Amino acid sequence: MRKLLWLFGFLPLFLQAQVEQARVHVEKLCSPAFHGRGYVNNGDAIAADYIAEQFKAVGCSSFSSGFFQSFEFPVVAFPGKMEVSINGKKLVPGTEFVVDPGSKGGEIANLKVAVVTLEEAFDPKKLKNKIAQVNMDGGGRSKQQLALLFSTWQVKGDSLKQLKKMLRELVTTFPVIEVVNDKFTWSVDQEQTNNPFIQVQYTAIELGESNFITYSIESVVKQHRARNVLAFVPAKKRSKKYLVFTAHYDHLGRMGQEAYFPGGNDNASGVAMLIELARFYKENPTDVNVAFIAFAGEEVGLLGSKYFTENPIFPLENIQFLFNTDIMGSGEDGVTIVNATLFPKQFELLQQINTANKYVVKVGSRGPAANSDHYFFTEKGVPAFFMYTMGPNRHYHDVGDTYENLSFAEFNDLFGLLTKFGAQVSEKAYKRGKKK
């Protein structure tokens, strides 16, 4: 206990260095040289190497298999041309248009566009007539080439869901243009659509009586080899038990060579937290092993963590607690804890620590959800929390999620909350597990 008191008396001095070093990590991981940590230009591989280098520099130990765990999966990538013009105006990728994460590529000039009204969209007969009308040449013959444009931003609720579903069906036959009036939220997909599917900002285009689209889009489906990055700090005395911290490092990558998604808050910030936690525990080992796992493939569907739980490097039953972190670059409005309702005692401990130290304004409770890498561990019986911050930064899965847009306002407090929780939850579990 005396050592714990000394340790956390030292913590405030340690924290300032932590946040400054975290800024360095995030700026690096968000830089164009990392290509959005995705599937173009080996972005995720560059990030994996960087994280492993940081674990080594900190002095962490590797597992018997090394610092990496490899696995494969199919993914849609956009490595080359990404050009779209509507009525002669060239649109800016990432801000004025995005392609659907599973969009097929293609190249065509001056393809006629049928602008579908909402009335036509929700009436199959009128929609069919509209397509037939626009799809005729001057001699009354069908041209068999046409793109469909829908403005979905005027629709809400169930009607919007119905319309979105319709677009998914129509893209099997036609290129589809969806006009939106809110920020883009991009993603990653593993399967291609039959035709190009393009989202365009309402403010970026002007429509007339006759409308045309020109596009050149390179889209490929490839089998991708990714790597989880793993390290640990051994316990002070030999132990089979683990406290585990995790964060995914992959993001969305590039959409062509001009636009990339930096992924500052999601989740370069979580990776920075992971690296700095490794530094802290290397200098302050505990009675249990402390493992650090940076997962790949989270944005594709939690693939890295799923693979790890099916092929564990150490027995999952030896994990006393797992803490998954994401969106660590803000926190002005507090944090939310997924799985809080599954593990009420641990959640109560976390709240007590936060209240006693006045770390963040709120520690919110949320039930189980398959929304990050904690999920498959929980499914295997591992006690786990997933913590993400809340704050004014609304950039998520867009090109504005940059290093410059992060406040790091609560990074120090989040670090303190995590380390104090880690010390107490592992100490209590260790004492319960000791033989008398």
Where do the protein language model's features map onto the residues?
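N-terminal capping segment at the start of a domain
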Residues: 19-42, 46, 58, 62-63, ...
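Metal-dependent peptidase/peptidase-like ectodomains
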Residues: 286, 295-395
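Soluble metallo-hydrolase cores and metallopeptidase-like ectodomains found primarily
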Residues: 105-113, 118-124, 180-262, 279, ...
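Bacterial Sec-dependent N-terminal signal peptides
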Residues: 1-21, 25
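Extracytoplasmic/secreted proteins, especially bacterial periplasmic and envelope-associated proteins
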Residues: 21-24, 28, 42, 46-57, ...
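Noncatalytic luminal/extracellular "stalk/propeptide" segments of secretory-pathway proteins
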Residues: 35-146
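Second-shell loop/turn segments in exported
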Residues: 32-42, 57, 69-72, 113-116, ...
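His/Asp/Glu-rich mid-to-C-terminal helical/loop segments that flank catalytic regions of hydrolases
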Residues: 279, 394-436
